[in-house]
Amino acid sequence: MSDVFERVKKIVVENLDVEADKVVESASFIDDLGADSLDLVELVMAFEEEFNIEIPDDVQESIRSVGDAVSHIKAHV
């Protein structure tokens, strides 16, 4: 597992109050991890802060899974 994935996983566990073993790259934030639209906004803000990046609004809409987040972050750090 990559460092980016582990950091994303930690943020997801803390923000969504889910068990760490449920946070896998294929997990959908909404369908698998129970996030709502506000949770998604808060996750993106946490990712931006953790990785010191800015995720544009149009990209935020395409981040629907843990893997989507990891891929985007890896491409911009």
UniProtKB/Swiss-Prot annotation:
InterPro entries: ACP, ACP-like_sf, PP-bd_ACP, Ppantetheine_attach_site
Family: Belongs to the acyl carrier protein (ACP) family.
Name of encoding gene: acpP
Protein name, UniProt field: Acyl carrier protein
Subcellular location(s) of the protein: Cytoplasm
GO terms (BP aspect): lipid A biosynthetic process
Lineage: superkingdom: Bacteria
Upper classification of the organism: Bacteria, Pseudomonadati, Pseudomonadota, Alphaproteobacteria, Hyphomonadales
PROSITE patterns according to UniProt: CARRIER, PHOSPHOPANTETHEINE
Transmembrane segments: none
Entry-annotated residues carrying O-(pantetheine 4'-phosphoryl)serine: 37
Keyword presence, Oxidoreductase: no
